């Protein structure tokens, strides 16, 4: 396994890809209101990414039919943005990415439609997953090892009532959306490859509210919880530094 150190020019292109992605995220978040369909959110992201001269990297990836993955309530990952409309209190996770001049970005956010007052249980869930993400980002610093990232994420989830979906991982990113290394959301300190400044990673805890067992929806894409409880995904892409992950998006 080889984890590349990026050059300044490569990092400039990755930051640009991330800037475009952040613009798409911000536009979608403004439309995360009751009555808006997942398909409409997909169109917003697609328009912004393409109008900026970038390419949506999810579209066509292993045959995926959309620009975003949209996960609603018991969806966990790989959700097709279909005609379902957002309702007050829903938990939504959106994963998206862009390619700028051959270099990738990839990030995910979660939110409760209507905010925490609309559903305090779901607000607590997704903010805990975000806390785990940020703990992993903090551990992604030069001199640490890959296992330190997983340990940091797992420590947050272990101290919560939630469960890691361990079959899904973070990853390296660069010329391809998914590169070495696999970044597990669990692990032991002081294990795995040594982290160096300039490595570019996606840190991506994927968590179930209840039992972590999942299944594939009949549409062949959406991964959903078996017990019908919620799933949640948060993800940042960025660069390893001496003080943790420099978050691009």
Where do the PLM segments sit?
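Active-site neighborhoods and metal-handling regions in enzymes and metal-associated proteins
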Residues: 1-249
């Amino acid at each position: 396994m080889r984890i590349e150190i990026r050059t300044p020019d490569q990092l400039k292109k990755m930051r640009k890809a991330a800037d475009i992605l952040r613009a798409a995220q911000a536009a979608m978040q403004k439309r995360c209101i009751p009555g808006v369909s997942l398909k409409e959110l997909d169109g917003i992201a697609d328009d912004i990414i393409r109008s900026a001269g970038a390419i949506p990297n999810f579209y066509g990836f292993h045959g995926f039919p959309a620009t975003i993955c949209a996960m609603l309530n018991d969806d966990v990952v790989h959700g097709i943005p279909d005609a379902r409309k957002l309702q007050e209190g829903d938990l939504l996770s959106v994963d998206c990415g862009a390619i700028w001049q051959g270099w990738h970005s990839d990030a995910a956010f979660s939110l409760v439609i209507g905010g925490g007052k609309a559903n305090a249980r779901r607000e607590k869930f997704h903010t805990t997953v975000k806390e785990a993400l940020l703990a992993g980002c903090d551990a992604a610093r030069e001199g640490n090892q890959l296992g330190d990232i997983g340990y940091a994420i797992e420590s947050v989830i272990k101290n919560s009532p939630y469960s890691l979906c361990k079959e899904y991982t973070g990853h390296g990113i660069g010329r391809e959306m998914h590169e070495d290394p696999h970044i597990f959301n669990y692990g032991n300190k002081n294990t795995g490859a040594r982290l160096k400044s300039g490595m570019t990673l996606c840190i991506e805890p994927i968590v179930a509210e209840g039992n972590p067992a999942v299944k594939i929806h009949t549409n062949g894409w959406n991964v959903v919880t078996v017990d019908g409880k919620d799933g949640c995904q948060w993800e940042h892409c960025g660069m390893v530094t001496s003080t943790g992950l420099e978050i691009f998006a």
